[in-house]
Amino acid sequence: VLAFLKVDFSVYAFNTVDRQVVCWLVKPSEMKWNNSAAKRLAQISANGGTPLAEVYDRMLHVLTSKKPDIFLTLSDGEPADANAVKLILKSYRSLGIKMTAIGVGRDTFSATSIANNLKYLGYDKVLAVSRLPDIPNRVLSILSDN
C-alpha cells in the first residue's frame, strides 16, 4: 500500500535471540518493497519478551539522521520496561517524530488490550488489529491523519 502511494518508508524488525535484542533492516528507504523484502520479514519470528525501549534506543541514531515524520510500531504484546519506553517516546517526539503504534492480537479483545497498553505508554496514535488483512487500511488511516 505504501509503495503504491509512493510513500518513502523503511521497514525494521526486531526480536530477542538468547536474551539479546536483534534488529534487522528489512527494507531501506531507497529500495522498493518487493518479494525479497517480504520473505525477509516473514522469516523473523515473534517470540515475545522484546525490550522495546532497548530497540528504540538502538534505532535512535538512525532516526536522528533520517528524521522521519512518523514512526509506526506493530506490537503483539507489552514492553519489558514500560517506564523506559515512556521516556524514549518523549525523546523521539522531541525530534519531531510522531510515534504511532498498532496493537496486533489474536482476537478483538486481545488486540484492544494491547492497543490500550500502548496508549498508556504515550504513543501519539494507537490502533488495534485482530485480522492481519486489516493492517494496510489501519496504516492508511494513520497516514491520512498526519
Map each language-model feature to its residues.
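Acidic, glycine-rich A-domain
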Residues: 1-146
